[in-house]
C-alpha cells in the first residue's frame, strides 16, 4: 500500500484504515460490481479479506478534463457600469480584460475579441431580477470568468474556412450553368437539391431562357452539403440563451423594434409587453424567447454593419436554441418568434432551411395547428387573444405571399382553408400609438388577392382560355384596389415612409411578374395584354424610384426580406430596356439601372442574399457592353425586321421617330461628358456619392409614368379592352404633372420588348458569369 494512501486516510488502532463517510467502493468490488463495506469496516474491506487480496484500495474516479469549448467567442464585452468605483478606468490602448461584468457566456477571451465590436455590450445585467425558471435568473451570468473557465482555440481558423466556403457558395450558379451536364447530373446523397421555383420565380425565368431542353426540370444538383461540427454543449447553450444585454443596450434595441418594425408588422402587443419589460416583475416577466427575438430585430435596424452582424448572430443563436428546446410552451409566442426570426438570414449556404422562407413555413405550421386560420367566433375566446390571432394570421399571410413571390415556391398557407374575418381598426388595440393600421389592412387585402391571381394565371392545370381571362380580371382587381388606397398610402414625390414603400414595392413587383413575357412564349402566344410593356416599364421605374428615395434617406434597413427580390425583378426589366433600339428609352433605362445598382449595394449591407444578386450583375460581360451602347451616339437597332416594321408599316399611325439626341440636354450631357468605364457597385467597391436617376435630386417617383387623373376614375366595371392601364398606378396628387419622356415610343416597341425578353435571351450571360441561387 502506498504511503500516499496511508497518509491520506486515518487509521484505527487495530491497523484497519477507516474511510471518510461517503467514500466509494474499493477497486476489486468496483470491478466486480458488488457491494463494498470499506466505508464501514475500513481497508481492506470484508470481500478483500475473504479473498486474501492485500492491495485493497479505494477506487478513484478518473478526473474528467474540462470540456474544451470551441464555440466562437462572443466578440463583445461590456465596460464597467458608471457607478463602479472599484474598476479602474481603462485607457483607449488598454486591452479590455474579463471582469465581473463580462458576458455570462463561457468562452469569451481577450485575445480574440473583435475590436470593432468591443463597444457593443452583450452581457448579463447584474441588476436583472427575473427568477422564473423559464426566464432569467438574477445570478446567472453575473459571475466573473476565471482562468479555469476561459478556453483557447485557434483564432481565425474556422472563420477563414467559413469565408472560403461562402465565397464558393456565392458562385455556385456559375457551376450550375457552365457545366453542360448539370441539368442531367444525378442528385446524389450529400449533394443539395436546388429547386428553382415555379413559373413565377425569377430563377426559373432565367433558367428557362438558357435551357430549352430543361422545360420540365425544376430540380438541379447543387453544392455538397457542408459538414459543420457541433460547437458547444447544452450547458453552454442554455447559459448563453438566458443571457441578456446590459439594460442600456437592451432598452435601445427594444425601443428601436417598437419604433421602426412593430408599427407596420404588429406582431406583438406593445402595451402589454412594455409593461412587463419595464416593471421587471419576477412574477410576470416578458417571455425570454420573445425578448431575444425583439433584440435580434432591433439590432438589424439600428447598429452599424460590423456590430450588427455580430449582434444578430448572437441573438439568433439564442432565439433558435430557446425555440428548438421548447423553453417557451405558449404556442402563440412561438408563432410570434418565428415571424421575428425572418429578419435574420444565415450565409449563402442555405436558402431553404435557414432564412425567411423556412421560418414563415414554421410559423404557418404552428398557426394552422392552433387553428388561427379559422374565425374565432366563440364568445369564450378572450378578446385580446382574438385580436392577436387575427393580426398574426394576416401578417403571416403577408410574409407567406412575399416570400412565395420571391422564390417562386408554393405558399405554406392555402387561403381556401381560411375563414378569418378581415382586419378592422379595433384589432390594433394595445399595439401602441405608432401602429400603422391602414397600412396593415390594405396590405393584407393585396396579399389576400395575389394567391388567387397566381393560381388562376400560373396554375399547372389552368387552361389557356382561363389563363388569358385571368389577366384581364387581375388587372381590374388590382386597379380597383389601387384606386381605393387612402391618400396616406398613395405614392408621394418625396418623404416616402417604409410602410407605403413596402406596399408599393410588393404591388409593382407583382405587376411585373404578372405582365412580363414568359420565356416559352410559344405556349402563351395569345394571352398577352395590350399594354404589358408600358405596365412593366412603369412598375420598374416606380420600384427604382422608391428604392432611391429610401436609400437617400437611410431607410433601406427598414425593408423586410423580400425587398431584395423586388429590386431584382425590376433590374431584370430595366436590363431588357437597356437593349431598346430607341436611344431615349435606353438612356432612361441606364439611369434607372445605375440607381438600382446603388440601392442593391446598400441592401447587401443588411441582407446576405443581396450580395449574390449584386455579383450576378457585376460579372456580366454583355451587361457592360449594353451599358456602353446605351450611352453611345449611334442609334441601335434590335433587328432589321423590327426596324422595317416600325418605319414602313402603314397600319401604324405613329411610327417611332429617331430622336435627335442633341435636343435633350440630359441625354446630350450623358453623351458628351467623358464617362469612366461603367462598373456595377459591389461591397468591395469604394464608396461613391449617392446617385439619382436624373440631374434633379428630388425627382418624383411617378416621373416614369404618363400623367393621369386617377382620383376621378370610377371603379372599374368595363371590359378589359377599355381599361386604362394608368389606373394601376395611384399618386397622392392627381393633378401632378408627370414627365412623359420615358414612355415615348414604348407602345411601338411592344414586339421588340417581347423579343428581347425571350428570343435574344438577354439574361443568359448573367447566368454564365454570375452567381446566384435564389429564385
Curated annotation (Swiss-Prot):
Protein induction: By omega amino acids.
Bias (Polar residues): 1-15, 126-153
GO BP term, pick one: DNA-templated transcription
Compartment(s): Nucleus
Gene3D superfamilies, sorted: Zn(2)-C6 fungal-type DNA-binding domain
Molecular functions (GO terms): DNA binding; DNA-binding transcription factor activity, RNA polymerase II-specific; zinc ion binding
Major subcellular location class: nucleus
Pfam families reported for this sequence: Fungal_trans (PF04082), Zn_clus (PF00172)
PROSITE patterns according to UniProt: ZN2_CY6_FUNGAL_1 (PS00463), ZN2_CY6_FUNGAL_2 (PS50048)
Region (Disordered): 1-20, 126-159, 630-699
Segments of skewed composition (Basic and acidic residues): 630-644
Keywords assigned by UniProt, alphabetized: Activator, DNA-binding, Metal-binding, Nucleus, Transcription, Transcription regulation, Zinc
Gene Ontology cellular component list: nucleus
Biased composition (Pro residues): 674-689
Location of the DNA-binding region in this protein: 26-59
Purpose of the protein: Positively regulates the expression of genes involved in the catabolism of certain amides, omega amino acids, and lactams.
Name this polypeptide is given: Acetamidase regulatory protein
Organism: Aspergillus oryzae (strain ATCC 42149 / RIB 40)
Gene: amdR
